[in-house]
Amino acid sequence: MKFQYALAKEQLGSNSRSGVKKLISKHHWLPEYYFSDLSFSVVQQWDSRAIEKTTIISCMRPANQEIYPL
């Protein structure tokens, strides 16, 4: 099961797990315990107008784990 977040005007300190954890926690997307078996990828890109940078975080959960509504 996959879910994705796109953030405008966000700066991710690093692509490390702690950096992603801090960013997701800041927005209260996931409970703290979700990070134990969370895998993720991070892409930073400029939009077509190149005005602001968008950080896209894709999170993948094991299929047998339920994701609660955010």
From Swiss-Prot:
Could you name the domain of life of the organism this protein comes from?
Eukaryota
Instruction: Look up and give the organism this protein is from.
Output: Saccharomyces cerevisiae (strain ATCC 204508 / S288c) (Baker's yeast)
What else does UniProt say about it? There are 3 tandem-duplicated genes coding for this protein in S.cerevisiae (YLR156W, YLR159W and YLR161W). Additionally, a fourth copy has been disrupted by a Ty1 retrotransposon, which led to the prediction of the 2 dubious ORFs YLR157W-D and YLR157W-E.
The name this protein goes by in its record: Putative uncharacterized protein YLR157W-D
